[in-house]
């Protein structure tokens, strides 16, 4: 049996998709996540900026033990511990917080840590991040990510923001480990259909 940490990391890098759910209410977050799961999404990040987000993490983790439910915007070790206690199977942070990463590693929970510059990316990797979230991608761009990966190909990057079926092939061609997708799925009229389409495009482009 593979360790749970490796199972989660494999789920992210095999499907190459992390759904980022950042919505105004807990009920919206739960409903969108549930419909995205119906569409085939296997890794779902519920951001802690949503009031009641921890309850959503716990509910989804309980109802969908086969899905990798993560907590996003985890800024410190306390939030990390609370998220893990609620059932989060991976943690996402917009910045490098060594105490948070250390606690996650103690409990063998994968971390996706935010960075933008090459120095920040290396710092995140040296701190023990399993994946490095390139953020904000709108400011950096796909060409820049490809340039960064040239000397840092050994560090698995996950760009977040602005992903659509029209541009994912460019990200994958740049060599990223996975892609964080948000509004294309979370704000769709038919969440499950958009999730299926996005995953299909990713699978064909991989």
Q: For each of these PLM feature ranges, what is it?
A:
Residues 90-103, 134-142, 174-197:
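Glycine-rich phosphate-binding active-site loops on the catalytic face of alpha/beta enzymes
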Residues 20, 45, 70, 92, ...:
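Conserved beta-strand positions in the central sheet of alpha/beta enzyme cores
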Residues 22-24, 50, 71-77, 93-96, ...:
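Glycine-rich beta-to-alpha transition loops that act as phosphate-gripper elements at the mouths
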Residues 62-67, 108-111, 155, 160:
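Short acidic, glycine/proline-enriched helix-loop-strand junctions
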Residues 41-46, 84-89, 105-107, 117-145, ...:
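Glycine/Thr-rich beta-alpha phosphate-binding loop at enzyme active sites
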Residues 1-89, 106, 165-166, 185-206:
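Conserved N-terminal beta1-alpha1 strand-loop-helix module at the mouth
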Residues 40, 87, 95, 108, ...:
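Conserved functional loop/turn residues at catalytic and ligand-binding sites
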């Amino acid at each position: 049996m593979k360790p749970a940490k490796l199972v989660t990391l494999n789920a992210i890098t095999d499907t190459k998709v992390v759904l980022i759910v950042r919505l105004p209410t807990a009920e919206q977050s739960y409903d969108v996540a549930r419909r995205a799961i119906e569409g085939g999404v296997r890794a779902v990040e519920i951001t802690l900026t949503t009031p009641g987000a921890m309850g959503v993490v716990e509910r989804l983790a309980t109802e969908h033990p086969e899905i990798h439910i993560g907590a996003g915007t985890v800024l410190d070790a306390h939030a990390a511990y609370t998220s893990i206690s609620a059932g989060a199977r991976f943690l996402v942070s917009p910045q490098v917080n060594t105490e948070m990463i250390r606690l996650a590693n103690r409990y063998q929970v994968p971390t996706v840590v935010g960075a933008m510059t090459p120095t920040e990316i290396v710092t995140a990797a040296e701190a023990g991040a399993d994946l490095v979230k390139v953020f904000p991608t709108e400011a950096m761009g796909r060409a820049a990510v490809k340039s960064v990966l040239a000397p840092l190909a050994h560090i698995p990057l996950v760009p977040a923001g602005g992903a659509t079926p029209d541009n994912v092939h460019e990200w994958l061609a740049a060599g990223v480990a996975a892609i964080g997708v948000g509004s294309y799925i979370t704000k769709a009229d038919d969440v499950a259909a958009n999730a299926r389409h996005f995953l299909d495009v990713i699978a064909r482009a991989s």
